[in-house]
């Protein structure tokens, strides 16, 4: 039984060329005998909420992606710098929300979930903001030889290793399922012009594109990177089904992310 990925993950081409198999351990699971596990997915940003924490239960790998919601949980997020805690109310089954605050860059946040006599926690530190200067476009040839138009994210990586990024594309208002992640291990302090190779939906001139850029912490990056490895989208694939890395304690799957956010909207040219 594993957390079936809701997204198809694509690591940026510049990162793919430099990767070596990670040493981090992932848990190999018996798909027939593993018990159901809590699945927690939540994010806060530097933009005022509302924010949502989604809590569900894992299902057998062979079943459809219909995750049973977890109701009646107590959910809080605490700013570890100023000590303020924020409660999340259950708006619908398994969906917990608040609009009480905006995250502060460089602050550490702790998520606590109490459900069915079990406590789950996660810690995420919100990085400083990196400005997405512009989005341009480049013609490329895909792995299957098809010509495609890709967005290029242009931004200045701050000096100092340990900067991690995630990008999400919306084309004509529709979110593209690919999630792109990037780290600055080989490009520290440089001006980045990163093409977002997208094999699930091709940009066309005249489309409306919204590109979101998130500055994420290492644990968030490792979650999506390990998910890419497990699903084979990074050029490496787990020998047997496994769960992606998580920053959650208590035996839960998923992730909690505190990140900064900015976006660019434009017409594809």
Regions found by a protein language model. Give the residues of each.
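A sequence/structural signal for flexible, mid-protein segments enriched
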Residues: 24-269
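Short, intrinsically disordered, low-complexity terminal/loop segments
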Residues: 1-2, 269
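Bacterial N-terminal signal peptides that target proteins for export
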Residues: 2-10
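C-terminal motif of bacterial Sec signal peptides marking the signal peptidase cleavage site
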Residues: 19-22
């Amino acid at each position: 039984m594993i957390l079936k990925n809701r997204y198809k993950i694509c690591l940026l081409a510049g990162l793919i060329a430099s990767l070596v198999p990670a040493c981090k351990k992932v848990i190999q699971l018996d798909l027939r005998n593993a018990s159901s596990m809590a699945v927690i997915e939540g994010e806060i940003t530097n933009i005022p909420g509302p924010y949502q924490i989604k809590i569900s239960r894992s299902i057998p790998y062979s079943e459809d992606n219909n995750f049973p919601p977890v109701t009646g949980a107590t959910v809080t997020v605490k700013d570890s710098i100023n000590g303020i805690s924020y409660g999340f109310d259950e708006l619908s089954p398994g969906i917990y929300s608040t609009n009480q605050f905006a995250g502060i860059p460089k602050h550490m946040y702790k998520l606590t979930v109490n459900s069915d006599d079990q406590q789950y926690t996660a810690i995420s530190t919100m990085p400083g903001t990196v400005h997405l200067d512009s989005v341009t476009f480049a013609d490329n040839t895909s792995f299957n030889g098809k010509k495609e138009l890709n967005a290029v994210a242009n931004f200045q990586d701050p000096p100092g290793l340990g900067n991690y990024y995630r990008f999400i594309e919306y084309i004509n208002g529709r979110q593209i399922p690919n999630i792109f992640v990037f780290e600055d291990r080989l490009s520290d302090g440089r001006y980045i012009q990163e093409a977002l190779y997208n094999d699930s939906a091709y940009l066309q001139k005249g489309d409306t594109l919204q590109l979101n850029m998130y500055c994420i912490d290492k644990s968030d990056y490792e979650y999506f990177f390990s998910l890419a490895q497990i699903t084979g989208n990074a050029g490496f694939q787990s020998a047997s089904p496994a769960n992606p890395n998580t920053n959650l304690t208590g035996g839960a799957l998923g992730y909690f992310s505190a990140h900064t956010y900015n976006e660019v909207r434009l017409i594809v040219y």
